[in-house]
Amino acid sequence: MKLHRVVLVVALLLATATGKAQSFALKTNALYDLALIPNIGAEVALGKQWTVSADWMYTWFSSNNRHRYWQGYGGYLTVRRYFGSQTSDLRPLTSAFSGHHLGAYVLGLTYDVEWGGRGYQADHFGFGGGVEYGYALPVSSRLLLDFSVGIGFQDGEYKEYTPQDDHYVWQSTHKRHWFGPTKAEVTLKWVLGKKGGAK
């Protein structure tokens, strides 16, 4: 529950920052949407090339009689530096979020996944972080398509279990120390705010 409070505080800080920020964007990762993981994020421009964002995902699908679980929630906090054109006259709102970008992020995630056989449950948050690279392409005056990948680490503990009748039988507990891809995004980003932004 503590992570929920952290995300709420960050969201409030992002909302407060929009008054001083050049622009503000709401976004969703289409890859998670396709995987039936609803998600939403917010990104705030801090000056002309830096942004900070918070993303949250949550899914809670289950079918006890068929032993199907697709559950999890968590999110990312990310700081980015954009290297795109920051002086676009055609799309002034999206200019702070366009072009190549590098970033650093931290993440927290918990899940319970089982599809009729062995299940995997992380009932406590696993944490990690990494670095990312991406490219954001303006589609219209307010809409961008952002592609990004991240490499980093994730630590945590998870349990393996098997369904037997109406019970779930614990099999083993494992520590996860993962290094590799920890983030992938094809994000639709909708920019809000007034044209011209802060000077």
Predicted region positions:
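Bacterial N-terminal signal peptides
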Residues: V7-A15
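Solvent-exposed loop/turn segments connecting transmembrane beta-strands
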Residues: A25-G41, Y58-T59, S63-W70
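Outer-membrane beta-barrel pore domains and translocons
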Residues: L31-D33, M57-T59, Y105-L109, G150-Q154, ...
